[in-house]
Amino acid sequence: VIGGDECDINEHPFLAFMYYSPRYFCGMTLINQEWVLTAAHCNRRFMRIXXXXHAGSVANYDEVVRXXXXXFICPNKKKNVITDKDIMLIRLDRPVKNSEHIAPLSLPSNPPSVGSVCRIMGWGAITTSEDTYPDVPHCANINLFNNTVCREAYNGLPAKTLCAGVLQGGIDTCGGDSGGPLICNGQFQGILSWGSDPCAEPRKPAFYTKVFDYLPWIQSIIAGNKTATCP
């Protein structure tokens, strides 16, 4: 996260960290004891998922690591378009217990409204050159825009996507924050999919997969319908 501050240790009990190698990682959101939600483009064959992590250098006493038991991507996703249906549900190999630093974030009950102030968070780059990564996650506030702002900036916007950022630039998600949550008015509304390169450019908000539009799919998969298709 560019232009943010260190997150409070108690602010992100639902934020999980997926690592595949030291240089490749993503954010994830715990939505119940056994499932996390992230971006489809974060999918890797062998991944480790750490819940209750804060500082990379010092483990929280309740930090846990899980592997993925099964990963679910929309069967109707266009494989060669990163931003199409960029959402993935992962079932953990064993459930996690709620603790001081572990608690799921519930799915949204309403869609977000344009103009909302939204919170972003992650262990991603804190410099636009993407050469500095923090030991603890950084948090910042950004704004939810009308989708036309992104359509004008990038000549288009995928369906079921939110457009969020800061028009003057300087505050944004960045490399390594992918898959992490966009939280608007306390509700889990978006999953970081894609943004400008370099990050935090003026008038170039980022794309967040709109969680609300995928609720039927998410609920079907969790209920055991493994072949549910996305809207």
Swiss-Prot record:
Keyword hit for Protease: yes
Taxonomy of the source species: Eukaryota, Metazoa, Chordata, Craniata, Vertebrata
EC main group: hydrolase
Subunit relationships: Monomer.
Main location: secreted
Disulfide bonds: 7-139, 26-42, 74-230, 118-184, 150-163, 174-199
Distribution of this protein across tissues and organs: Expressed by the venom gland.
UniProt miscellaneous comment: Negative results: does not activate factor XIII (F13A) and is unable to release kinins from heat-treated bovine plasma. Does not cleave beta-chain of fibrinogen (FGB).
Peptidase S1 domain residues: 1-223
Domain of life of the organism encoding this protein: Eukaryota
Signal peptide: none
Post-translational modification: Glycosylated.
GO BP, sorted A to Z: proteolysis
GO MF annotation list: serine-type endopeptidase activity; toxin activity
Family annotation (InterPro entries): Peptidase_S1_PA (IPR009003), Peptidase_S1_PA_chymotrypsin (IPR043504), Peptidase_S1A (IPR001314), Trypsin_dom (IPR001254), TRYPSIN_HIS (IPR018114), TRYPSIN_SER (IPR033116)
Residue numbers marked as site, Required for specificity: 172
Catalytic residues of the enzyme: 41, 86, 178
Similarity-based family: Belongs to the peptidase S1 family. Snake venom subfamily.
Cellular compartment(s): Secreted
Residues bearing attached sugar chains per UniProt: 146, 225
pH relationship of activity: Optimum pH is 7.0-8.5.
Enzyme Commission number: 3.4.21.74
Protein name: Thrombin-like enzyme leucurobin
One Pfam family from the record: Trypsin
